[in-house]
From Swiss-Prot:
Its EC number is 2.4.2.1. The gene is deoD. PANTHER family: PURINE NUCLEOSIDE PHOSPHORYLASE DEOD-TYPE, URIDINE PHOSPHORYLASE. It holds the Pfam family PNP_UDP_1. GO terms for molecular function: purine-nucleoside phosphorylase activity. This is Purine nucleoside phosphorylase DeoD-type.
Length: 236
């Protein structure tokens, strides 16, 4: 069955889907990390692929930018294609002073300025948290790989060019590790659908210091994050 935004056939997606924002990043993951990967969807050029990693079937698909786009794809994957787990893999800007460029952050919870989860949760505040099983496996995978991963709260912003930069003072006070644009929505959709979600991020720039990574540095650290995610999928 196809949906308005996904034209894959039934059974095309694995139980677990990696979800970068950029569809070309999804293609990169499929070509460089998955074996025998095949493209399964391409509506609006939002590419999706399925292959295997260490013998286990895994899919990867882009989400686009922001909570609305990510929520559409996550809902359709969970509801129409039998996907059980979505792991977002992406970049973020750091606000905490002790977070460095290229650090890996695992989002235990996701605060947000979006009202999407309030709409979903009948006007109340919803605690948008990762699925514990996925979180535990990712932490263990990072430890086994010798990669230091920071675990904590992240912030999903509705605006990239914020008109209120003073918000970063508040985020730093509350020990928010990084800022991105999708996780809170993904966690809300997973809860609504009774499924599982996790967000693993690489720090691409530091909002407080103005530091930025080069494209080569982003690629290297992004690969570390991907291996954590993939190894967590095949963990028993």
């Amino acid at each position: 069955m196809t949906t308005p935004h996904i034209n894959a056939v039934d059974g095309a997606f694995a139980e677990t889907v990696l979800m970068p924002g950029d569809p070309l990043r999804a293609k990169y993951i499929a070509e460089n990390f998955l074996k025998d990967a095949v493209q399964v969807t391409d509506v609006r050029n939002m590419l999706g692929f399925t292959g295997t990693y260490k013998g286990k079937r895994v899919s990867v698909m882009g989400s686009g930018m922001g909570i609305p786009s990510c929520s559409i794809y996550a809902t359709e994957l969970f509801r129409e294609y039998g996907v059980q787990n979505i792991i977002r893999v992406g970049s973020c800007g750091a606000v905490s002073r002790d977070i460095k460029l290229r650090d890996v952050i695992i989002g235990m919870g996701a605060s947000t300025d979006s009202k999407a989860n309030r709409i979903r949760f009948k006007g109340h505040d919803f605690a948008a948290i990762a699925s514990y099983e996925l979180l535990e496996k990712a932490v263990n995978a990072a430890r086994a790989l010798g990669i230091k991963a920071r675990v904590g709260n992240i912030f999903s912003a509705d605006t990239f060019y914020t008109p209120e930069p003073e918000v970063f003072d508040t985020l730093e006070k509350y020990n928010i590790l990084g800022v991105e644009m999708e996780a809170a929505g993904l966690y809300g959709v997973a809860a609504e659908e009774g499924k599982n979600a996790l967000c693993i991020l690489t720090v691409s720039d530091h909002i407080r210091t103005g530091e930025k990574t080069t494209s080569d540095e982003r690629q290297s650290s992004f690969n570390e994050m991907l291996i954590i995610a993939l190894d967590s999928i095949v963990a028993e």
